[in-house]
């Protein structure tokens, strides 16, 4: 077993990946040597992200590339990465360099004391609507998933390998990573990190995708643990079904097109 696995969902980021991998390696190589892996999960990108991943994997032994057969979304791509990870500790981060590689060791060290560690961003570089939606999402997830109000869930986070092992075999219809972590992690902490400017391009998440994710969360986890009550749960379920008629997508599956390992 390796000391650390880093899971990165990739979508249309071919121009960023070289710099991202180099910065991660620069921050980890002295501490971990060859005892870590970076798993890059290509979520059916429209650019040459997969070609870039294959080139990087030929250069570095610690790179593992996974090419998905079709787009499953950020949480689905992360779930595939988790299923293929071998680290005793696992850190999940984005592909846009807004998550600072300099904070990876700090997150890793927190996992000696906690089951999960979420990052709390200082001076967030996201646009206002994304910050607002994220804040609302964190508020409601406290009710839905019994999350402590003082814990802020974010996309850069770390978990212990045994936490992953407890949920990775569940194969949910549509995985919502934070709900799975919150269910299995007994003690959780936050650490503050600096939020960097996006290195290239613009965010691949828009308002529609964020709302689809939120509705997926309600549709697939509204039973958890019946905190809305039967009436609110029924209304939410009906609204979600109507929304899905207009923004339907495939159920999540584990169809991998190609691997580099």
Residue ranges and their predicted role:
Residues 1-127, 243-246, 251-260:
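Structured catalytic core of nucleotide-sugar glycosyltransferases
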Residues 12, 16, 33, 169-173, ...:
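Alpha-helical structural elements of signaling/regulatory helical domains
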Residues 15, 176-261:
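Hydrophobic helical membrane-anchoring modules
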Residues 61, 114, 171, 185-186:
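Structural motif
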Residues 66-70, 74-84, 101-175, 196-215, ...:
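Acceptor/aglycone-binding surface of glycosyltransferases and processive sugar-polymer synthases
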